[in-house]
A protein has these predicted regions:
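Detector for a conserved hydrophobic position within an alpha-helical segment of the HATPase_c
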Residues: 4-6
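Glycine-rich ATP-binding loops of the HATPase_c
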Residues: 9-15
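Glycine-rich GHKL/ HATPase_c ATP-binding element in histidine kinases
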Residues: 20-22
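Disordered, acidic interdomain junction associated with two-component signaling
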Residues: 25-54, 140
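Charged docking surfaces used in two-component/phosphorelay signaling
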Residues: 64-72
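Acidic, metal-coordinating helix/loop segments flanking the phosphotransfer/catalytic sites
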Residues: 79-97, 138
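Acidic catalytic/metal-coordinating carboxylates
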Residues: 81-85, 106-112
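Alpha4 helix (beta4-alpha4-beta5 surface) of REC/receiver domains from two-component response regulators
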Residues: 108-119, 125, 130-151, 156-161
Length: 169
């Protein structure tokens, strides 16, 4: 939550009362300016060419968000809920790109999953996604060949750019 608040340049007000508990109020900046563009996608958004993407995340809502955004961008999306399911899927199927959540519980995290994927598909393109800061395990995944690190929360512009860059390299 704190990372999201910081990303949006907001702040948190906390009030505690021993008898009533704690109240957290989240504040985010807003604008009163009307949108002047009428485009569904800004010029910064790079659309897909129906490439296949496997999204691996243990949180159903995160899988759904990524799937909806990528679908709008013209990608063919498959989602799975664990590293183990991703490896099983890739034993039987090909995909142009894998987007791996770094922190998954229980089971393999993004780094362990990527190591398993490399054993069966050594040239698999992948992106690591996380809502947390870039850790040593993320850096290790990048050293092993993960092409990009994508910070959550996803935005249309951010995910479109990172996915397109990885697919094009």
């Amino acid at each position: 939550v704190w990372g999201t608040v910081q990303d949006h340049k907001g702040y948190i007000d906390i009030q505690s009362d021993e008898n009533r508990g704690t109240v957290f109020e989240l504040y985010f900046p807003m604008t009163r300016k009307a949108r002047t563009d009428r485009q569904v996608f800004s010029h910064d958004v790079i659309r897909g060419r129906n490439e296949s993407i496997l999204v691996v995340d243990d949180i159903p809502e995160q899988r759904e968000i990524a799937s909806q955004i990528l679908g709008r961008l013209n990608y063919a999306v498959t989602t799975v809920s664990s590293g183990e399911k991703a490896v099983a899927f890739l034993r039987e199927n090909d995909t142009d790109l894998v987007i791996l959540d770094m922190i998954m519980d229980p089971g393999m995290d993004g780094l362990d999953t990527y190591r398993e994927i490399l054993a069966i598909k050594p040239n698999q393109k992948a992106i690591i996604a996380s809502g947390y800061a870039e850790t040593d395990r993320v850096k290790t995944a990048l050293d092993l060949g993960v092409g990009r690190y994508l910070k959550k929360p996803y935005t249309l512009e951010k995910i479109s750019r990172v996915v397109r860059q990885e697919l094009d390299c």
